[in-house]
Amino acid sequence: MNLEIRTERLTNSVMSMCETLCSQHEICIQMLERRDYQTVYKVMKKEQRISRMVEMINHQVMELMPLVQPVPATLRRLLVSSHVSFELLHMRGSARAAAEFADSCEDEELRIYVEELERSLILTLRVVIGMY
């Protein structure tokens, strides 16, 4: 398959993962606002899907890396994809922590603070998506 097409698919996978994680954080915000209650189980399911996507993306990056040395733009996209998948793997746990916290927290001020953190993560992911 053409290298550009494979790199484009990889980029789309990373962007899709960012969108999935944004959705996960939005669920946590809804929980924190007590508007649309979602169970921690649903957040954990999303975590598992993100983990599988990270593994797939990292596998594709490793497979494509030796082929793209002469093409700086393609190499840059692969490196960004690899970095993003690494960061997202670490970020995904925060949504679960927020969901568990929302289940038990009675302190309104603290809940608002966590909600702001979740919004900040979504903003960061939107910026990452824009980098492509």
Spans of model-derived segments:
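Cytosolic, long alpha-helical scaffolding segments
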Residues: 1-132
